[in-house]
Design a protein with these regions (language model features):
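Positively charged, amphipathic and often flexible ligand-engagement surfaces
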Residues: 2-544
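A short structural micro-motif
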Residues: 89, 102-107, 122-123, 618, ...
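Conserved structural-core and active-site-/substrate-pathway-adjacent residues in large, well-folded domains
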Residues: 90, 216, 301-302, 416-419, ...
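Pre-Walker A segment
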Residues: 183-192, 196, 227, 242, ...
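Active-site proximal loops enriched in glycine and acidic residues that flank catalytic Cys/His/Asp
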Residues: 218, 303-305, 335-337, 364-366, ...
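Terminal low-complexity tails and localization/encapsulation signals of metabolic enzymes
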Residues: 461, 473, 477-480, 484-613, ...
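Extended, amphipathic, non-transmembrane alpha-helical segments
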Residues: 642-648
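Substrate-binding/gating loop at the entrance of the active-site cleft, primarily
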Residues: 688-718
C-alpha cells in the first residue's frame, strides 16, 4: 500500500515544468481552444462562411468546367497523374511500389535491399501494368523497378511481358535494384526542379518566360543532429544568395523566393525545448530573413506537424515584431486548411500584421500530414483529431479561410496553393475581377500543377499569376519527398487522381463542397470509418493520454505536478489487509538526490510466508467470484488510474527518473493492461472457469507501475 504526507524540506522539482512561451492572449487562446474541437462543431461554422451567392456559384461552376475540360482534352495520363492512376494505392502493386521506395531509402546495405526487393517483387503482378496503350512514363517506371536500365528506354512495349519473365529469371536482385534506382531518378526529374539551386534556376527560366514565378525548397528531412541543422542552414544561405542574384531586383511579387523548413534548422524543434528553440533557432531564422530582405525576395516558413504549430507562431511573431526586418513584405507563413485551428491562426496573423504595420505573405494549403496526424492522435490517446476526417470538410475550410485572407489584403498577400480546378475557380471569382500585381497569387507543386495553371497564367487565359513550389535536391534527398507526393496524390479523394479517372464525371469534380456538406445527413459528421482515439480498439476503451503541445493541458498538468512536488510517499507491505511493520528506508529521486520521494518498508521473509498462507485461504472465496465480476474489478481499477493519472505521473517521474512522455506511456500501458485483460476475460472465460490460484510477481524497477499492473490483474482474472 502507499500513503503520503507532505515533506517539509523537499525541493519543488517541477517548478519550471512547461513554462508558457508567451502569455495566452485572446487570439492565441482561440487557437488553443480549437485544437481538437469536435469536427461537426467546426464545420457547422465554416460551411456558412463557405456558402456563396447562387450567381457566384454559377460562375464558379462554369469556370471550373472549362478548366477541367481543357485539362482532360490534353491529358494523356503522363507524369504523376498516369503513375498514381496506374498504381492505385488500393492495389497490391501500388502499395508494393510505395513500400519499396520508402524502404530502400532507409536500408544502407545492398544484401538487405536485395532481400527486400526479392520479397516484394515476387508478390507483385507487374506484368499487368505493361503495355495496354498506357503512357511511356508509367511503363518506364514499371520496367525500371524490375529489369535492366536499357528496357526503361524501350518505346515499343509489345512482347515485353514475356521478356520480363525471362529477364527476372536470368538477372539477380542487384539488376532489379539498379532498375529501382533508375525509376526513382526518372520520377525525381518529374518532381524535383534540379539537384542544385543553380541547376533549378536555369531550368525554371522557360516557365518564367511564360509568366510563372518560383519558390525554391531545399529538400531534406528534419535535422536529427546539430551537424544536420548546420548543413541545412548553409544550404538555405547559399540558395538565398543564388535566388537573390537571379531575382535581379524583380521584387517579392514578381521574382523568385525561398521556402524553409524549421525542423531542418534545429534538431530539437519541439514544444518541450521551447526555450532552446527561441534562443537558438530564432537567431538563425532571423539571419536568413535578413539576407532575404537584402535581396528583397520572399521567405516562406513551411507548415509542419500540428504539434509544432504554436511554436512556429511564436517564431513568426518575433520576426514580425523585429524592427530590423521592418519595411520588408517578404515574411511568409504556410497555413494548412485541414487543421481545425486554421481560421483562428489566420485571425492571429492578420492582427499581428496590422498591429505592426506589416504586410505578410500567407500560403494557404490543404495539408500535408493528414494520415500521420490521425494515427498519432489515436496512438497517443488524445481527445480528438487536430484535422478533419473528410476531404470535403477540408475543402470547405479552405474556401472559408480563403475568403478571410482576401478580405485582409491590405496586410496579407494571399498565396493559394491548390491543384483542384474547383477550388481555383472559387478563389478566382471570390477575389473579383479587379486585379493588380501583389493582389494575390496561385501556387502549385513542380511536376504536378503546370497543366492546370497553363490555363490560368497569361493574358489569353485567366490572367492570374502562379508560383511553382520547386524542390531542389539530390537523388538521395528526393525519395522521401517523392513517396509523400505519390501517397498524397494517389489517394482516391485526390483531385489529381480523379481527373485522370474518366469514370468520374465533370459534374462530380466541380461540385460545390459547401453544398455537398449541407446535403449530408449530419452536417460536419466525422468519417464513420475513422474511430476517435478513445474508440481505437473497438469494444475496449483506449487509455487517454496528455497532449504535450496543448498550452492549456500543459498549464493544468504543471499546476498538478507543482502541487504534488513536495509530497512524501510511504510504501508499506500488507498481509491479509493489515499493514506490516518493519525497517523503512528513504527513496530518492535518481535525477535529484535532494528530492526525497518518500520511504519504503521492506517485508521480512516470515511475513512473505504469512502472505502466501493468507492468499491460499482467499482462493476459495475468490473462486466464487464470476469472471464477469472479476473483469469489472479491473475496469474500475483502470478508471481510477485514469482519473488519478496526473498525480501518478509526478510520482513515477520522481521515483523512476522518467521523462514526462515516458511516464505518460507507462501509466497508459498499465490502464491498457487492465482493460485488455478485462475484455479478454469477458470474451474467453466461461462462467465455470476457476481462478489460477496463488501467484507471485517480481517487477523491474524501471517500470514501477506498468509491469505489476500487467502481471497481477492477468493472474487475478485468469
Amino acid at each position: 500500500t502507499m500513503t503520503d504526507k507532505v515533506s517539509a524540506n523537499a525541493t519543488p522539482v517541477f517548478e519550471s515544468f512547461a513554462p508558457p512561451i508567451r502569455a495566452q492572449t485572446p487570439l492565441r487562446k482561440a487557437i488553443t481552444d480549437a485544437y481538437r474541437r469536435p469536427e461537426a462543431e467546426c464545420v457547422t461554422a465554416l460551411v456558412q462562411q463557405a456558402t456563396l451567392p447562387e450567381e457566384t456559384t454559377t460562375q464558379i461552376r462554369a469556370t471550373a468546367r472549362k478548366l477541367i475540360e481543357a485539362l482532360r482534352a490534353k491529358h494523356k495520363g503522363t507524369g504523376v497523374e498516369g503513375l498514381v492512376h496506374e498504381y492505385s494505392l488500393s492495389s497490391q502493386e501500388g502499395v508494393a511500389l510505395m513500400c519499396l521506395a520508402e524502404a530502400l531509402l532507409r536500408i544502407p546495405d545492398m544484401a538487405t535491399r536485395d532481400a527486400l526487393i526479392r520479397d516484394k517483387i515476387s508478390n507483385g503482378d507487374w506484368k499487368s501494368h505493361v503495355g495496354g496503350g498506357r503512357s511511356l512514363f508509367v511503363n518506364a517506371a514499371t520496367w525500371g523497378l524490375v529489369v535492366t536500365g536499357k528496357l526503361t528506354n524501350t518505346v515499343n512495349d509489345s512482347g515485353l511481358s514475356a521478356a520480363l519473365t525471362r529477364l527476372i529469371a536470368r538477372c539477380g536482385e542487384p539488376v532489379i535494384r539498379r532498375g529501382v534506382d533508375m525509376a526513382m531518378r526518372m520520377m525525381g526529374e518529374q518532381f524535383v526542379t534540379g539537384e542544385t539551386i543553380d541547376e533549378a534556376l536555369k531550368r525554371a527560366k522557360s516557365l518564367e518566360e511564360r509568366g510563372f514565378r518560383y519558390s525554391y525548397d531545399m529538400l531534406g528531412e528534419a535535422a536529427t543532429t546539430a551537424a544536420d541543422a548546420e548543413r541545412y542552414y548553409k544550404d538555405y544561405e547559399t540558395a538565398i544568395h543564388a535566388i537573390g542574384r537571379a531575382s535581379a531586383g524583380r521584387g517579392i511579387y514578381d521574382g523568385p523566393g525561398i521556402s524553409i523548413k524549421l525542423s531542418a534548422l534545429h534538431p530539437r524543434y519541439v514544444r518541450a525545448q521551447s526555450e532552446r528553440v527561441m534562443g537558438e533557432l530564432l537567431p538563425k531564422v532571423k539571419a536568413l530573413a535578413a539576407l532575404s530582405k537584402k535581396y528583397n525576395i520572399g521567405l516562406n516558413i513551411d507548415a509542419e506537424e500540428a504539434d509544432r504549430l504554436e511554436l512556429s507562431l511564436d517564431l513568426l511573431q518575433s520576426l514580425i515584431e523585429d524592427p530590423d526586418l521592418a519595411d520588408w513584405e517578404g515574411i511568409g507563413f504556410v497555413v494548412q486548411a485541414y487543421g481545425k485551428r486554421c481560421p483562428f491562426v489566420l485571425d492571429f496573423i492578420i492582427d499581428l500584421a496590422r498591429r505592426n504595420n506589416r504586410r505578410v505573405m500567407v500560403r494557404l494549403v490543404k495539408g500535408a500530414y493528414w494520415d500521420a496526424e490521425i494515427k498519432r492522435a489515436q496512438v497517443d490517446g488524445l481527445e480528438d483529431f487536430p484535422v478533419y476526417t473528410r476531404k470535403v470538410h477540408t475543402d470547405v475550410s479552405y474556401i472559408a479561410c480563403a475568403a478571410k485572407l482576401l478580405g485582409a489584403r491590405d496586410v496579407i498577400f494571399p498565396q493559394f496553393a491548390t491543384h483542384n480546378a474547383q477550388t481555383l475557380a472559387t478563389i478566382y471569382h471570390l477575389a473579383g475581377p479587379d486585379f493588380k500585381t501583389g493582389s494575390y497569387e496561385f501556387q502549385c507543386l513542380h511536376g504536378m500543377g503546370e497543366p492546370l495553371y497553363d490555363e490560368v497564367v497569361g493574358a489569353s487565359k485567366l490572367g492570374r499569376p502562379a508560383r511553382i513550389y520547386a524542390p531542389v535536391g539530390t537523388h538521395e534527398t528526393l525519395l522521401a519527398y517523392l513517396v509523400r507526393r505519390l501517397l498524397e496524390n494517389g489517394a482516391n479523394s485526390s483531385f489529381v487522381n480523379r481527373i485522370g479517372d474518366k469514370s468520374v464525371s465533370v459534374d462530380e469534380l466541380i461540385a460545390d463542397p459547401a453544398e455537398v456538406v449541407r446535403s449530408m445527413a449530419v452536417v460536419g459528421a466525422r468519417h464513420d470509418q475513422i474511430n476517435l482515439p478513445e474508440g481505437l480498439y473497438g469494444i475496449r476503451k483506449n487509455s487517454a493520454g496528455f497532449d504535450l503541445s496543448n498550452e492549456e493541458q500543459l498549464a493544468e498538468l504543471s499546476e498538478t505536478l507543482k502541487a504534488n512536488a513536495t509530497r512524501a510517499w510511504t510504501a508499506e507491505p500488507q498481509v491479509a489487509g493489515a499493514k506490516v511493520k518493519g525497517e523503512s528506508r528513504p527513496v530518492l529521486n535518481p535525477g535529484d538526490h535532494s528530492d526525497v520521494v518518500g520511504t519504503v518498508t521492506e517485508i521480512a521473509a516470515d511475513d512473505v510466508a504469512q502472505a502466501m498462507k493468507a492468499a491460499e485461504k482467499a482462493v476459495a472465496s475468490w473462486s466464487q467470484v464470476s469472471p464477469t465480476d472479476r473483469a469489472a474489478c479491473l475496469d474500475r481499477a483502470a478508471d481510477i488510474m485514469q482519473r488519478e493519472m496526473a498525480e501518478l505521473l509526478g510520482l513515477i517521474m520522481r521515483e523512476a527518473g522518467k521523462s514526462m512522455p515516458n511516464a505518460i506511456a507507462e501509466v497508459r500501458e498499465a490502464i491498457d493492461f487492465l482493460r485488455y485483460y478485462a475484455d479478454q476475460t469477458r470474451r474467453t472465460l466461461g462462467v465455470a472457469h476457476k481462478p489460477l490460484g496463488q501467484t507471485a510477481c517480481i517487477r523491474p524497477r524501471t517500470f514501477p507501475r506498468a509491469i505489476f499492473t500487467g502481471h497481477i490483474p492477468a493472474a487475478l482474472v485468469a
